[in-house]
């Protein structure tokens, strides 16, 4: 049996880096075709998938994979000790009268997350299902945002991606790295049992509040930024379960 990871047919810097990282690994990364259809003769050998969430879900069904991810309402259950902001999870219609609020749909598909002066400012609002579930939070200013690929409660690789209102993948300072790892250890000791063993966690510094959890994302569809591709690949593989 081959250990095949199905790659989205859409070429990205991340998928190209994963492909390169797999050269001396036990894994074979294959894009197959542009039809999002894994040929029958390869389906038993596909042990993981990486790409857009819709693509991954289609391939998972074809190849009998379980894609691990946190529960939809997971973030709303995390203590403010770690989020440093109030987070709510409810139907979109329940926030119709809120102003100056951050909103993100729980399925990551309905609309682009962001800060909105009014909920009705969401692009395409009139066509949205008002019963759909969303996260909301108070608006905060992030001074730094960092992506972490986590396996078995350990950060395997990490990369900054946002600093002072600009895209930035430069290395953390020694103090930032030390403080983030300390924050992560305190967080994971309390919440490890609520997460899959392979997951992507984003942490950051909120102005005036310090280190905080941003969110959790499935490894099988998360961007790498400047993370070590070989280490990220192992987390991605472990985030998919062959049934």
Residue ranges with predicted function:
Residues 31-33, 198-200, 220:
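Extended, compositionally biased low-complexity polar/Lys-Gly-rich tracts
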Residues 52, 202, 228-231:
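Poly-acidic low-complexity segments
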Residues 137, 201, 214:
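Active-site flanking residues adjacent to catalytic metal/cofactor-binding acidic residues
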Residues 146, 196-207:
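A short glycine-rich, hydrophobically flanked beta-strand micro-motif that places a catalytic Asp/Glu
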Residues 194, 207-243:
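C-terminal active-site "lid" helix and adjoining low-complexity regulatory extension at the edge
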């Amino acid at each position: 049996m081959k250990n095949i990871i199905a790659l989205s047919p859409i070429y990205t810097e991340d998928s190209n880096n994963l492909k390169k990282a797999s050269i001396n690994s036990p894994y074979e990364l294959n894009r197959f075709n542009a039809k999002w259809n894994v040929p029958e003769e390869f389906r038993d050998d596909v042990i993981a998938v990486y790409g857009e969430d819709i693509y991954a879900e289609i391939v998972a069904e074809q190849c009998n994979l379980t894609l691990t991810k946190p529960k939809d309402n997971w973030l709303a259950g995390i203590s403010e000790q770690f989020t440093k902001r109030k987070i709510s999870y409810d139907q979109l219609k329940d926030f119709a009268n809120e102003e100056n609020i951050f909103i993100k749909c729980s399925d990551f598909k309905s609309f682009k997350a962001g800060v909105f002066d009014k909920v009705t400012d969401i692009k395409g609002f009139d066509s949205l299902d008002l019963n759909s579930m969303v996260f909301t939070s108070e608006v905060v200013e992030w001074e730094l945002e960092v992506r972490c690929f986590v396996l078995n409660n350990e950060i395997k690789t990490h990369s900054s991606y946002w600093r002072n209102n600009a895209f930035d993948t430069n290395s953390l300072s020694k103090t930032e790295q030390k403080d983030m790892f300390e924050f992560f250890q305190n967080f994971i000791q309390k919440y490890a049992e609520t997460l899959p063993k392979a997951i992507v966690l984003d942490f950051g510094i909120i102005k005036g509040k310090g280190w905080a959890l941003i969110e959790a994302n499935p490894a099988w569809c998360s961007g790498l930024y400047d993370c070590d591709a070989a280490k990220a690949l192992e987390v991605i593989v472990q985030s998919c379960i062959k049934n």
